[in-house]
Amino acid sequence: MVRCSISGASVLPSDTQVGRQLILVINLRKKIEEISIDDAVDVINNIKNTYIEKRISKYPQKDERVLDKDYVFLPLQVPDDPVSKLSKINSRELLEAAIKISKEQKVLLLIKRHPLDNSDFLSEVLDSVKDEPFVKITNGNVIDLVKNARSVIAVNSGVSLEALYLGASVWNSGTSEWWGAVNKISCLSDIQKAFEKDQPEMLSYQKNCSLFWLEIFGLGTMMLRNLCTKGG
């Protein structure tokens, strides 16, 4: 099972189940749009403040403080992550493209290795950039890494969902249950947008989608659950 870093949240374990949830979002689009944007913002802000203040995360985190500011954060996934198949751009392509753009644009890229990924390829790539001034490997706390980031890029890592609730500009190349809430990477050139200084604000529908998944994961309020049980 692929799990999000937020305590209490988990992503469904198979491609089939993810597909069902994507269909659910499509079918509930009208109801998602009916959610009060003020309510969505209030709930998300409350969670954001709680998790930033207490530095809560699903997995144990090392208390390694992040001193850098205004960087692009790339949390890596395990190569055999089943949900990563739901992307035209795999983790390797995303990593290599992000490193290239970081060096060209001289924008700091912080990469956090997944604790279960011991692949030779990743070790070689990370070893090759250890002396690059604009590429750093970090073991910092996920909450701190997201909070101080210009943007967060991933295939469809569960950290992306956490980043949405922490107010980050999130860019994904792979579909997921929260696909409607993120900025899309449809081709490698789109990755450059995540390195731009000015990041797009979340649209109302994106915020409502975020609240939708808070409800599904039991982290929000009963508001959406009540809305979905109404007639129509």
PLM ranges: what are they?
Residues M1-C4, K112, V155, S173-T175:
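Generic beta-sheet signal
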Residues G8-K69, A181-G232:
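Leloir-type glycosyltransferase catalytic cores
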